[in-house]
Amino acid sequence: MEFTESERLQSLSDEYILGGVNSPSRSYKAVGGGAPVVMKEGKGQYLYDVDGNRYIDYLQAYGPIITGHAHPHITKAIQEQAAKGVLYGTPTELEIKFAKKLREAIPSLKKMRFVNSGTEAVMTTIRVARAYTNRNKIIKFAGSYHGHSDLVLVAAGSGPSQLGSPDSAGVPKSVAQEVITVPFNDIEAYKEAMKHWGNEVAAVLVEPIVGNFGMVEPKPGFLEAVNEITHEYGGLVVYDEVITAFRFHYGAAQDLLNVYPDLTAFGKIVGGGLPIGGYGGRQDIMEQVAPLGPAYQAGTMAGNPLSMKAGIALLEVLEQDGVYEELDRLGKKLEDGLNELIDKHDITATINRVYGSLTLYFTDEKVTHYDQAENADGDAFAKFFKLMLNQGINLAPSKFEAWFLTTEHTDEDIEETLRAADYAFSQMK
C-alpha cells in the first residue's frame, strides 16, 4: 500500500496540532512510530484513507461505532435534528425519550444525567460518591483506564496497602494519595486494601468486564465479593461501563453478569458516534447532584439534542432481534480462525474474546490481570500491526486494545482478515 498523502498530511498536522494527533492513542508510538494513516471516509465496516486504500476496520473509533460507519438510520436521524438546531440550552423531549430507553435497558439507572464524555461521567460519579459517603479515597484496578481526570491517572503503589503515585505529569501527589490501586481479579489483594483503608473509601471503580488492557472477564465470584466487601465498609460500587454498555448485549455488562453497582458511568456506543457520556444509579445517591443536592455538575453541551437523537436511533438499531447473536457468531469465527493460524505458524499468542470483541496477546499465558497484559510481547504486536495494516486491516495501534466487530461485518470480512493474518504470522519468524 502507498501512504504518500497520509505522510504529507501528517507532516502538515505536526505544524499545527501538538504531536500531530488530538489523542495520543492515535499516534503510532506504541507500534514503532511512523505517520498514522489519515482517514477520509467510513462506510459500514470499512474505512478509506486519503491515498484511496480500503481497510476492514476493527478499531471502530476505540469502540463507539458498533453499527458501523455512517449507518443510514443514525445518519438520517442526525441530519433531521441538525436541520432543527443542534443546541438549545433548554430541556428537550429527546432527553426524556433517550433516558427512558436507557433505563428500560439498564434498570439500575433509576435516575441519570447526561454529560459529554466518559471522562466526565466517571469524574462525576467519583464526586457524587464522595458527597454521599463524606469520604475521599477511591480504589481502582490496575490497568483500567477511567478517563484523563487527575484522580484516575494514578499508578499503583508497591502493594495493596500502599497509596498511589501520579501516572501523569501535572497530577499532584496529594491527589494520587487518595487512590489505592489493586490487581483486577485478585480478591485477596482487594480484601487487604479494604482492611487498611476501607473506612476511608468512598467508592471502588470497576470495569465489570475489562476493556482497557484488552478484553478480560472477571473470575467467577470476583464482582460479587467486591460488592459485598465494599458495602460492609460503607463504600459504594461504581461501574465504568463506558466501553461495555451495549457492547455484548442490549443493556450493560452488569445485566449480563447479574451483578449490580450503586452507580454506573456510560458513554461511547450510546452516542451513536457523537460525543456523549452519562451516569446514573440509585435515586438516594443521585439526589446528591445539583439542583437537588450539594454535588455540582453542569455542562453547556450536556444532553444536546443532536447526541440525544443519535443515541435514540442507535438503540433502535441495536434492539432488533439477532443483532448480538450475529456479533457473537462472527467473533467466534474470527477467534477460531486466529487460533488455527497461531497453531499453524507456531506463534506464541493467546486470545481473550467476549462476544464480538477480542484481544490478541503475544504471550503464552491466559490474561486475567494487567501485569500479564503488560508482559505480552509489544514488539511482536507492532510487527503484526504493520503487516496487517499493509493488507488493509485496521487495528488499534496498541497491544492493549481490543478488536471490535460491528453489525456490518460479514463472513467475507472475517475470511479476508484471516488470510491477512495467515500472511502476517508467516512473516513473523
Swiss-Prot record:
Keyword Isomerase: yes
Pfam families: Aminotran_3 (PF00202)
Transmembrane parts of this sequence: none
Keywords: Cytoplasm, Isomerase, Porphyrin biosynthesis, Pyridoxal phosphate
Subcellular location: Cytoplasm
Enzyme superclass (EC): isomerase
Gene Ontology CC terms: cytoplasm
Highest taxon of source: Bacteria
Pathway: Porphyrin-containing compound metabolism; protoporphyrin-IX biosynthesis; 5-aminolevulinate from L-glutamyl-tRNA(Glu): step 2/2
PROSITE patterns xrefs: AA_TRANSFER_CLASS_3
Catalyzed chemical reaction(s): (S)-4-amino-5-oxopentanoate = 5-aminolevulinate
Enzyme Commission designation: 5.4.3.8
Residues bearing the modification N6-(pyridoxal phosphate)lysine: 268
InterPro entries: 4pyrrol_synth_GluAld_NH2Trfase (IPR004639), Aminotrans_3 (IPR005814), Aminotrans_3_PPA_site (IPR049704), PyrdxlP-dep_Trfase (IPR015424), PyrdxlP-dep_Trfase_major (IPR015421), PyrdxlP-dep_Trfase_small (IPR015422)
Cofactor requirements of the protein: pyridoxal 5'-phosphate
GO terms of biological process kind: protoporphyrinogen IX biosynthetic process
Molecular function, one GO term: transaminase activity
Family classification: Belongs to the class-III pyridoxal-phosphate-dependent aminotransferase family. HemL subfamily.
Quaternary data: Homodimer.
Protein's name according to its UniProt entry: Glutamate-1-semialdehyde 2,1-aminomutase 2
Naturally occurring in which organism (per UniProt): Staphylococcus carnosus (strain TM300)
Gene: hemL2
